[in-house]
């Protein structure tokens, strides 16, 4: 995701909106980094900084958002097959 090109800007807009997935989200950070903000059980934000070489696993239905810190490459690992859908939280 390159936040400096048009496709990257669209991805940044989408990933920075608070959302959840029915399945766990497993990400490997290939290059660059950024911040995952994740809601805890009390609905408070917890910020996790990720960088190249990190692996992060978000539990199913955990509301979260991602903010890149410059250009970032991430890969998603699917535990149960490729079905990527997001449910966005209303403001």
Roles of regions detected by a PLM:
Residues 41-42, 71:
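Short strand-connecting beta-turns/loops that link adjacent beta-strands
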Residues 47-48, 55-57, 75-78:
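Short, low-complexity, polar/charged sequence segments that are solvent-exposed and flexible
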């Amino acid at each position: 995701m390159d936040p400096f090109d048009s496709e990257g800007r669209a991805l940044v807009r989408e990933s920075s909106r608070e959302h959840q997935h029915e399945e766990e989200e497993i990400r490997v950070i290939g290059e660059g980094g950024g911040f995952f903000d994740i809601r805890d059980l009390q609905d408070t934000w917890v910020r996790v900084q990720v960088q190249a070489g990190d692996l992060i696993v978000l539990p199913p239905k955990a509301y979260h958002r991602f903010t890149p810190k410059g250009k970032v490459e991430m890969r998603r690992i699917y535990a149960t097959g490729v079905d990527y859908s997001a449910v966005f939280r209303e403001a």
